[in-house]
Amino acid sequence: MIRWLRSHPLTGFVVLAYTGSWIFWVPFIPLQKLIPAESYKPAAAGVGQLALLAGPLLASLIMTRLTTGSLRAWTSSFKRWRVPPVSYALALIAIPAAIMTASAVLPGKEAGTPSFVGPAVVIGPLIQGVVFLIGGPIQEEVGWRGFALPVLQERIRPLRAAVVLGVIWGGWHLPQFFVSAWDTPQNNVTDVLGFFAFTITGAVVMSWITNLAHGSVLLAILAHNSINWALVTWSCLRCLY
């Protein structure tokens, strides 16, 4: 098994990432009906975190260790913060601006009761940014952009590598379509195809930023967090107008 993983780094990573996450996600699908309403969201959040830790994060640790003999490359990518300033501008400003602009222009659900009122209009989005950061991007990006992207780019050109990674990333989310507590569109096949279009587009943008930042996983994490933050924060703020 170890020999096979070493000789098939990309496939090995994908198998480990999917298995590690799905082993938590898939059983939760039938079990969710047995969970009391008041415990449903905390249970779903807990299972989601376990899946993130056991999926792309653990897979990247295992594969980095097996393919390089150490975790030095894994940890050094976190510390790579001295990168071109344009990388930060794209990750922290351009992405949220683009998503919020698109959300304002494109048709969506009718606005409901505002989630943020008073001082919370400022404080709420800041807190959300921190919560989202530790709730997914860190665990995911050490795997997707930290391990899988460089391996793919050794074989194919960056743009094609990003598209392939977007499909892999989208497929990894599939069990989430069957759990209402997880923020994944669940209405029809069009929603699924739209989600894959979103993950492919997101993968292209985040891979571009990561490459601009000389492979910095830190910038990939910030870019991923900006996507999550902008999507949710806009839905909270649009109710005010």
Protein language model features and the residues they cover:
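Specific transmembrane helices
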Residues: 2-137, 165, 232-241
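Membrane-interface helix/loop boundary segments of multi-pass membrane proteins
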Residues: 139-166, 207, 211-216
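Alpha-helical transmembrane segments and their helix-entry boundary regions
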Residues: 10-14, 88, 147, 161-162, ...
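Functionally important transmembrane alpha-helices
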Residues: 26, 163, 187-241
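Residue-level hotspots within the lipid-embedded alpha helices of multi-pass solute transporters
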Residues: 125, 133-138, 170, 195-200
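Membrane-helix boundary elements
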Residues: 159, 166-188
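Short juxtamembrane and helix-loop transition motifs at transmembrane-helix boundaries
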Residues: 123-129, 178-188, 209-211, 215
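Hydrophobic/aromatic residues in alpha-helical transmembrane segments
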Residues: 101, 148, 202-206
